[in-house]
Amino acid sequence: MRLNPGEIVRVLETKISDYKEEIRLEDTGKVIQVGDGIARVYGLNNVMANEMVEFVETGTKGLAFNLEEDNVGIIILGDYKDIKEGHTVRRLNRIMEVPVGEGLLGRVVNPLGEPLDGLGPVEYKETRPIEFKAPGVIFRKPVDTPLQTGLKVVDSLIPIGRGQRELIIGDRQTGKTAIAIDTIINQKGKGVYCIYVAIGQKASAVARIVEKLRQTGAMEYTTVVVAASSDPATLQYIAPYAGCAMGEYFMFNGKDALVVYDDLSKHAVAYRQISLLLRRPPGREAYPGDVFYLHSRLLERAARLNEKYGGGSLTALPIIETQANDISAYIPTNVISITDGQIYLEPGLFYAGQRPAVNIGLSVSRVGGAAQIKAMKQVAGSLKLDLAQFQELETFAQFATELDPATQAQITRGQRLMELMKQPQYSPMEVEDQVVVLFAGINGYLDDLPINAVKAFEEGLLKFVKEKYSSLLDEIRTTKQLSKENETKLHAVIKEFKEEFVKLYGK
């Protein structure tokens, strides 16, 4: 084989001309202490607050949290067991971001956007920072569109609007998560994308919820973000912000999104743990001084944008667990003051069989009334006051031997209306069905029925109306109001059904 000197020269010249010397400066530091999900690092002098860093030897990511004079306190996002003293940490020159978009629908992911459901990698085209400034007053418009939960007691008495923040608060095992899951199930076909964020929940409980969402077809428009109780406090801390970023993607693209934070009590506990480990000074109940800001900066990101900015919305349903009904504790009062109302669930009502166990007197929606459809306003206008008065009268009636007819009539109707408010789990109702049922209740059609016949009457009435007068339901759905003509028609329909019902069941 003869070597051509000219050819060799040409190849060498090409290689030399293509050679580009690249000098890259990397800001690195050394781990001086590690444990409990926290690393102290020396040498990262130029690191930004909340900047992502990487532990070179293990590939684990971290978040620069405490910037001190001689070292940086880093919260480790993942397993810290393999990180040792002396390991190298390098800056990534970006703040923390998570994948967003429609590719996450139907998936179960951790707060970093990594899949947990075994369905392969998550497909995404965009990422968003987990911390983002809440939209200002100029970007917003008043809440004016309802977000139907499918629960009679909520949609009639404590209505929620798109863009609202409504707190669900109560003791453990009172049905807080059930209300949130029913709301997600009820968004089917309504163009609302849902994000369910599980913070510090048992993995088995989350698996049950995911399975229920799959069975009802709700996973098609839902993303589940999980930081289970077995995950480090650092992941539990960032979970709600990651879920919020995923919801914001839809809001800023002119769509409607709903995000459930289940629950923020455990989130505050995780933040307290991180803060104490980083030697931040403790305050009331050992929470750090900025625990109010922790939740306010998260919940303020829920908004209804005006048309100029796309008209999208992000509705937030934070959940808070109380201890022994104490809603005046530190975290509950903080979140009550941040949100636009609360749904208060009471163990006493729950164990008495009143489910959802909503305490109507203590629950309120500060902005949702404007979003309620006219038909529901017409039907449920005085319902909250009537039921609150009934509960007082019922307490008083326990001590009275004789009651005047007017008081007795009010108690009779109140008992039947309370029975009407009961609803089994995972069976949300369409708003037009709710209007028909509540119309029958407030107009006294149930007053002469025994309480145990109310459920059968409700089911029978809906079946009867759907079979024979479905056009009436269609009209309520499309016009969103009860015209005088439809009111008269509804009276006639209910009377017709009641005659049949009494014949079948007797009084």
UniProtKB/Swiss-Prot annotation:
Annotated keywords: ATP synthesis, ATP-binding, Cell inner membrane, Cell membrane, CF(1), Hydrogen ion transport, Ion transport, Membrane, Nucleotide-binding, Translocase, Transport
Primary localization class, coarse: membrane
GO cellular component: plasma membrane; proton-transporting ATP synthase complex
GO molecular function terms noted in the UniProt entry: ADP binding; ATP binding; proton-transporting ATP synthase activity, rotational mechanism
Membrane topology qualifier: Peripheral membrane protein
Keyword Membrane applies: yes
Subcellular location: Cell inner membrane
Classification via PROSITE patterns: ATPASE_ALPHA_BETA (PS00152)
EC annotation from Swiss-Prot or TrEMBL: 7.1.2.2
Residues carrying the site annotation Required for activity: S363
Superkingdom of source: Bacteria
Pfam family, one: ATP-synt_ab_N
Reaction catalyzed: ATP + H2O + 4 H(+)(in) = ADP + phosphate + 5 H(+)(out)
Cross-referenced SUPFAM superfamilies: C-terminal domain of alpha and beta subunits of F1 ATP synthase, N-terminal domain of alpha and beta subunits of F1 ATP synthase, P-loop containing nucleoside triphosphate hydrolases
Binding site for ATP: G170, D171, R172, Q173, T174, G175, K176, T177
PANTHER family per the UniProt record, alphabetical: ATP SYNTHASE SUBUNIT ALPHA, MITOCHONDRIAL (PTHR48082:SF2)
HAMAP family: ATP_synth_alpha_bact (MF_01346)
Family, per entry: Belongs to the ATPase alpha/beta chains family.
Assembly, per entry: F-type ATPases have 2 components, CF(1) - the catalytic core - and CF(0) - the membrane proton channel. CF(1) has five subunits: alpha(3), beta(3), gamma(1), delta(1), epsilon(1). CF(0) has three main subunits: a(1), b(2) and c(9-12). The alpha and beta chains form an alternating ring which encloses part of the gamma chain. CF(1) is attached to CF(0) by a central stalk formed by the gamma and epsilon chains, while a peripheral stalk is formed by the delta and b chains.
Function: Produces ATP from ADP in the presence of a proton gradient across the membrane. The alpha chain is a regulatory subunit.
NCBIfam families: atpA, PRK13343.1
Name this protein carries in UniProt: ATP synthase subunit alpha
Organism of derivation: Fervidobacterium nodosum (strain ATCC 35602 / DSM 5306 / Rt17-B1)
